[in-house]
Regions:
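Glycine- and acidic-residue-biased ligand/ion/polar-headgroup-sensing regions
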Residues: 26-45, 53-55, 85
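A short glycine-rich, His/Asp/Glu-containing loop-to-beta-strand
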Residues: 1-23
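Short acidic-glycine-tyrosine-enriched beta hairpin
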Residues: 5, 15-17, 45-62
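Extracellular/periplasmic catalytic domains that process cell-envelope and extracellular macromolecules
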Residues: 3-5, 25, 33, 70-74
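A short, N-terminal "cap"/entry segment at the start of jelly-roll beta-barrel domains
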Residues: 1-9, 50, 58, 88-94
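Ligand-binding loop in jelly-roll beta-barrel domains
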Residues: 62-87
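Soluble periplasmic/extracytoplasmic beta-strand elements of cell-envelope proteins
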Residues: 14, 40, 78-81
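Histidine-centered catalytic micro-motifs
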Residues: 20-29, 63
Length: 94
């Protein structure tokens, strides 16, 4: 993104069954496309949601949230982060 203070980071993510990330934020938006398994997402102030293969969702900039894998197999997804340059990709919630 020439001339901007943002960068795009694309990651293939695999989360172990039963893993819970703990409340955290990102310095930009996160677009997620589920590939396999089940994944839960709890954004503060919203009901917890479950996502499965073929579904997509977004985590808004700065939204405090928790997440993890459900079931007995890993949750696999592609995450596209559009975040401020030079800031940590993940920040524990205060």
């Amino acid at each position: 993104m020439p001339g901007s203070n943002f960068e795009v980071i694309t990651a293939m993510v695999e989360i172990a069954p039963g893993f819970k990330a703990g409340k955290h934020t990102h310095p930009g938006t996160v677009q997620v496309q589920m590939l396999d398994g089940e994944f839960w997402l709890a954004i503060d102030g919203q009901p917890e949601k479950t996502y499965r293969a073929g579904e997509a969702f977004e985590v808004p900039t700065g939204a405090t949230h928790n997440e993890g894998a459900l079931g007995d197999k890993p949750a696999k997804f592609v995450a596209v982060y559009i975040v401020e340059k030079g800031k940590p990709l993940v920040q524990p919630a205060q």
